[in-house]
Amino acid sequence: MVVSFIGMATQEVPVKANLNIVLKSDTEQLEEVMVVAYGTAKKSAFTGSAATIKNEKIATRQTSNVTNALAGQVAGVQTTSNNGQPGKDAEVRIRGIGSISASNKPLYVVDGVPYDGEISAISTSDIESMTVLKDAASNALYGARGANGVILITTKRGKSGEARVTFDAKWGVNKRGVPNYETITDPATFYELNYSSIYNADLKGYAAAGDLAKANAYANQAMLSSTYLGYQVYSIPQGQQLIGMDGKLNPNATLGYSDGTYYYTPDNWSDEIFENNLRQEYNLSISGATEKMNYYMSAGYLDDKGIVPNSGFQRYSARLKADYQVKPWLKMEGNVSFTHYDSREQDTEGGTSNANIFYASNIMGAIYPMYVRDAQGNIMVDNRGFLRYDYGKPGQDSNGSRNTIPNANPLASYMLDKMKYSGDVVSGKWSADIDIWNGIKAKVNIGVDVNNVRATEMVNPFYGQYSETSGVGGLIGVSSERTFSVNQQYLLTYNKTFNDVHNVDILAGHESYDYKYQYLYGQREKLYDPNVPELGNGIMNQSNNSYSRNYATEGWLFRAQYDYDGRYFVSASFRRDASSCFHPDNRWGNFWSVGAGWLLSKEKFLENQSWIDMLKFKISYGLQGNDNLMFQGGLYRNYYPYQDQYTLANSNGDFSTSLYYKGNKEITWETSHSFNTGFDFAFWGGKLGGSVEYFSRKTTDMLYFKPVAASMGYSRFPENVGSMVNRGVELDLYSNIIENKNFSWNVNFNLTHFKNKVLELSPELNGQLIDGARIYREDESMYQLYLPKYVGVDSETGESLWALVTPDENGNTVTKSYSVASENRFASGDILPKVYGGFGTSVTAYGFDLSVSFAYQLGGRILDYTYQGLMDVAATGSALHKDMLKAWTPENKNTDVPRMNINDQYTNRLTDRFLTSSDYLSLQNITLGYTLPKSLTRKMQIDGVRVFFVADNVALLTARKGLDPRQGYVAADNVYSPIRTISGGISLNF
C-alpha cells in the first residue's frame, strides 16, 4: 500500500490489519531555493553561510531605507544608525570588523547585478527578499567588492495566472523615538546649582575671609553676568538677591523678568524643537505571467516628514520588470527603475556645531528663552513677519548674553535657512539567457546605474553669523554630484545529472565594472532675494570647485559544484581580480574558496529517526580581497591610494601646491581569510529548525596609515601591515509551535557572539592612543578602551580622585591631579558587545494576524559624551543632568559626584566615569492586521482586503534614559533622533 500526503515523503508499506504510519517531511519536495551569487541554489546543497529575509517581514517595517529593516533579523548582521533622518542608510556590518582603515561596508546586489544607486531609492514594496551572504564560500565570486559580505536584493516578479493588481496605503504619525536625558528643567534649581559652582570657587576670597554676605552678593552678581549665565528670568524685590545665603532661590522671586525693553522667561527648547509629523505612503503594482512572459510594474509615493522643522524625505518611484521567452533557446529580461527623491536636512547634524539643533536640545540650560519677547511678554515678530529668535547676543536681539551656543539659535536656522538634496536615480538591467546545448547555457547581464544629486544650502541674511549685521548678508551654496556605473557579466554554465545521482554545476565567466563620479560646487555671499536658492542670487565672494573620480575592476571567475545523490556536496570557486586602486604592478589578486556539505538526514542510519526532518553539516574556507581604502578619518574613499595627491592654490597669481596625501606604489590587496562551519537542522515536522555556525574572519596585509616622522613632510603613510581576526558563533532558531487551518503561531530567535583581536601591528602603531579613548595593541580588541580610572571623591573636600596604575613614591594609590591620571590609563572594557541579535513571534487566527519583533545587545560599553557634557561641575549655562543634585556638599559626603566648582576644569575630562553599558532591548515593530473573508470581498469584485496597524521603533530600554547605543559603536551624540512611527493602512488585491 502506498501512503502519501502533500509535503510529506511517500511511503510504501505492507497491508496489515492495524497500521500506525508516521510520514516524514519531504525535504526534497519542500526544498527551498535561495538566491546566491550569480544564480540560485537549493538550500540543502548550499555549503556557505547565508540568511534570507522574506517580503513578509520587510513589508511590515515603515522605513524609507530598507537597511533599517535588517536590525535584529539576521544572525551575524549588526546595524547601527547615527542619523535618524528619514531616508538615511543604517551602517551594516557582517561578522565583525574587517579592517582598520579600509571600508567595512557590504556590497549590495539587486537582481543579480551590483548596485550603486541610493538604497533609499528602492521601495520596500518592490522587494521580494533579501539574502545576506556571510562567508567566502557564498560571496567570494564577487571579488573585492564582496569582502565585507554581500546583501542580495531580489525584486518582485509576476506569478502565473491572471494579472494581479495590488494597492496599499499607509497613513501615520512620526514622533521622537528616544526621550531626552533626565536634565534639570526647573529654572530655580538650575540657578541654585550654578550659584553653588561660583560660590564654592570663592573667586574673591570672601568666604575664606568669613564675609559670607559679600560672598553671597558676589556669587549672585557673577552668576547673572555675561561671563557666566548672562540671563535673569526671575523678578525679585529691590535690594534682594536671587539666591539667598542658604543657597536656595529667594522665596519672593517670581518667574518672568522685564528690563523695560524685553521680557525674559525660559522656554523648553526640546518642546519647541521637536514636533510630530505625518507620514504617508502609497504603492500600486500590476503583475502577471504566461507561458512565455513574466511582468511586474509598480509605482509608489512616500512622504516621510521628520521630527524637526523642515526635515524629511519624499520619494516618487517606478519599476518595470519583464522577461520574455523569445525562442526556445533564448530568454531576455529587462528591468528598469526610476526614483526621484527630495531630502530636507541640515548639514550641521552631529557634533557640537552652534547650528546643530540636536546639540541645542541636549545642552541648552533650563533658564534660556527660545524667542525674544517684548516688555509685556509677547513673542516679537520682525518686519518680514518672522518670529524673533533669541541668539544670546546683546544688540542682535535681546539684552541677554549666553555662553552656551553663543550668537546662534538652531531653531531659527532650521526655520529660516533652506537646505535640500534632490536626486534622480535610474537603475537599468538587461539580460539574456541562452540555452546552447545539453546543459550548457550562457548568460549576459549588463547593469547601468545613474545617480544625479543636486544640493542647495542657503543661509539667511537676517540673523546669525552670516547676517547683514555680521557683514555677510547671507550665503548660498549649490553642488551637483553625478555617478555613472556600468557592470557587465558574461557567464557560461554547465549543469548535468549523471546516473540520477551525480549532479554537476559549473560556472565560468568574466565581469567588468566601471565607475565615474563628478562633483561641481559653487558658493556666493550677499543675497538679493532670501527666497531664491540659486547662485545668481549672490554677488560677493564667489568661489567654486569641481573634481572627478574614476574607478574600475575586472575579474575572471570560476565555480564548480558537485553533489552525490543529494547527500554529499562539494564546491570550489576562484576569482582573479584587478583594481584600478593599485599600481599596475600590484593590481591583480587571486581569491578562492572551497566548501563541503553532508546531508546526514538522508543517510540510512538516520532514516528511521522520524523526528529529524533535515540535518546538514557544512564547512567552508576562502580568501577575499579588499581595495576600499579610506582617507584618514574614514569619511571618504581614496580611489588613487598609490599616487601622491596635491592641493592647488593661488599664490600671488602663480601656482602653489601642497602635499595632501602621500601615496604608496607598493600597497596591494587587503586579504580576508574566512572559515565557517556549522549545522542546519529541522526537527519534528517543522516544530523546531535553524542553524548553528562557528566563523573565523582573519584579515591580513591590512590597509592602514602608518605614522612617520614629521621631518618626512607628511604624518602618515599607507601600507599593508598587520592582521586582525574576528571569531564567533551564530545561532538562528525558529519554531512553528502551532500550524493548522485556522490558527498558527511561530517564534524566532537569533544570537551572535564574536570577539575581535588585533594579531599584528606595525611597531609605530602598537600602543598608540586613538581618539582619546582607545589604544591599538596586539592580542587585544581594536575597540579596547583605555581610560583614566575615576574612583569617586575625597569625602572631606569633594574633589575628584583617580586611580594610579602603580603607587607613587609616597605609597598613594590615588591622585587628585588629572594630568597625572591621564598618564595612568586602565583597560576599561571593550566597546563591542558580547552578544547581539533579535527575536520575535507571529500569530494568525481566523483572519487576524499579529507580529512582534525585538532587537537586543548585551555585554558592551559605550562612551556617553552627552552625559559627560551634562555632568560638568564648571558649567556656565549648559544643561545639567539630575545626577548633579547628588553633588558633594558638607551635608552629603557619601556620593561619587564632585563638589560644584566653576574653577574645576578637569573633573569633566574623559574618564571611565562616563563609560556605561551599551546593553539595550528594542521593541522594533508591532503589526496587527485583519484580512476580510473572501466570501465578503468577492462580492465587491476584490480578491483580498487587509486592514492593519503598524508601529515601528516602539520602545527602547537602556542603561540610561536618553542614551541610544544603536547610534554607533564608539559613541554618537547630538545626531538626528530615531523616529517612532505609528500608522494604519489598507491593502487591496484585485
What is each PLM-predicted segment?
Residues 1-319, 324-327, 331-333, 339, ...:
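Short, small/polar-rich motifs associated with maturation and membrane association
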Residues 251-262, 459, 463, 467, ...:
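Surface-exposed, extracytoplasmic segments of Gram-negative outer-membrane nutrient-acquisition systems
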Residues 43-45, 141-143, 161-162, 175-178, ...:
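Switch/connector loops and helix/strand junctions flanking conserved nucleotide-binding motifs
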Residues 286-295, 299, 842-845, 920-932:
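Hydrophobic/aromatic-rich, well-ordered segments within soluble, folded domains that form packed cores
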Residues 3, 25, 146, 288-292, ...:
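A generic beta-sheet turn/junction motif
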